Amino acid sequence: LCSLICYLIVCCPPTLTAQQQPREVVRILAVGNSFSDDGVEYLDELAKAAGIRLIVGNLYIGGCSLERHWENVSKGLPAYDYRKNCEGVQSNTPKTSLLSALQDEPWDYITVQQVSQNSGLYDTYYPFMPSLLQYLRTHATNPGVRFAIHQVWAYACDSNHSGFANYDNDQSRMYREIVKTVNRVSRKEHIPIVIPSGTAIQTGRNLMGDRMTRDGFHLDYGL
């Protein structure tokens, strides 16, 4: 998504001290699920077009909630597919722990997100988000790492996802609740960057119609 690369690379470049040279490579780690997989799908191509060298890691479990992320961390579970794109060279390491991926690179940015059906439900972020953020801050190897929260998109109007019922199967309501909740969490947890993927998709729907997903909730491969 254009919003991801714009906000993480163009709008929010890594902070450098007077002694540091500009980084040759920008490193982004997503602690997420299939929606983070969609969110980073075209980052490498966008980065190349912008003349930026990029390493992207995605800690992937389909449908993974913040509660499950924290359970994996607290129990040290090697539960993730660690999907990595290193300047166009892709790899996948199954049965990886969050700590292992976290310390694999000196990440410039780490993104977090709630599972899609709960993204607009504030209470589902707690107590897991503060604990997860503290763990990430403690164990990240780059002291200048910056954190971002991924504002995911609402489902298609005709989506059959069971979690759509949380919003009365109303796309507009789901979008509004996600935006409100993500902004509230980002302020409370002092997360400086909100990645507005949901707003980008909703704007696209307003312009081109509700044809943005391949199954009612995951993004279409042609986007």
Annotate each predicted stretch with a short phrase:
Residues 37-126:
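Conserved SGNH/GDSL esterase-like catalytic core that processes O-acyl groups on lipids
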Residues 14-18:
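Sec/Tat signal peptide C-region and signal peptidase I cleavage site
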Residues 19-49:
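N-terminal module-boundary/linker segments of secreted carbohydrate-active enzymes
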Residues 23, 49-51, 142, 188-189:
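Short, well-ordered coil/turn elements that cap or connect secondary structure elements
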Residues 35, 61-63, 154, 201:
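Residue-level detector of flexible, active-site-proximal loop/helix-junction positions
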Residues 95-221:
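Alpha-helical cap/lid subdomain in secreted, periplasmic
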Residues 27-29, 55-57, 146-148:
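A structural signal for isolated positions on well-ordered beta-strands in alpha/beta enzyme cores
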Residues 2-13:
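Bacterial N-terminal signal peptides
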